[in-house]
UniProtKB/Swiss-Prot annotation:
It comes from the Eukaryota. It is an enzyme of class 3 (hydrolase). This is Actin-41. It is found in: Cytoplasm, Cytoskeleton. Actins are highly conserved proteins that are involved in various types of cell motility and are ubiquitously expressed in all eukaryotic cells. Essential component of cell cytoskeleton; plays an important role in cytoplasmic streaming, cell shape determination, cell division, organelle movement and extension growth. One of its GO terms (molecular function) is hydrolase activity. It comes from Solanum lycopersicum.
Amino acid sequence: AGFAGDDAPRAVFPSIVGRPRHTGVMVGMGQKDAYVGDEAQSKRGILTLKYPIEHGIVSNWDDMEKIWHHTFYNELRVAPEEHPVLLTEAPLNPKANREKMTQIMFETFNTPAMYVAIQAVLSLYASGRSTGIVLDSGDGLSHTVPIYEGYALPHAILRLDLAGRDLTDSLMKILTERGYSFTTSAEREIVRDVKEKLAYIALDYEQELETSKTSSSVEKSYELPDGQVIPIGSERFRCPEVLFQPSMIGMEAAGIHETTYNSIMKCDVDIRKDLYGNIVLSGGTTMFPGIADRMSKEITALAPSSMKIKVVAPPERKYSVWIGGSILASLSTFQQ
């Protein structure tokens, strides 16, 4: 969250609401009945953490309202009734969801005006393009969205219910098989940190597996909050490999490369060349080192042999949806 025209968000925090597992015994401590974002993170040991957004779509409106309240009053420190608001939504978001968002903004927060933009389109804006295909992969879901001259092509948008949270789950499982127990919602956050710090995508998965069996070049160690150090080896690339091979976690779905290709093939034959040449990655789950090269390699294998393929991975892609929103909301034509 932040202000239009800024080049980076003012506030970045996980959309988590935590409620105490136990009742407070110390009177006058000012214990809250709910904590949001980083505060919920830091007190996670005594809280039950809930994610109000599932697969990119809001499933718990009371918690979502708490998150928005926290954003306006504690993070940005603004009065929402004084500022127009730009919210973003997942492509193919149900209409009822958008209506509910609008209702809460106008009725609970009294915002003067609001607009809901599609996330992937904003990422493309942020990359300075008006035509291309965006692979947007966050925590709850991934999408491939072809955009031509600024218009998303709804018939060719594909959704993949595979994203950051699934990778964290799969890493939890791999580590549990190795004898480290990670089960609670608080421990999941530790595993997420392991994933973000150490995971990478292999250019050639089979070859990387062979290498990791014989050499220790892949091994890194991670220190848990209690000081215990665990070695992390082939898990580093096995975990995000799921993006290309969802069958590894028992999902019957095409990988992100195939989904991108299928999405391009659903578009008019005349615009495919422009899409192949402008494949833009966006979202936190595209932050793994090695993802652009691997994506390029996989799509080249699927596409016609003479086709020029370009995968763009902007360094700020974790926030490119927000940056695109900042650009859009600061245009005078948009404000009218």
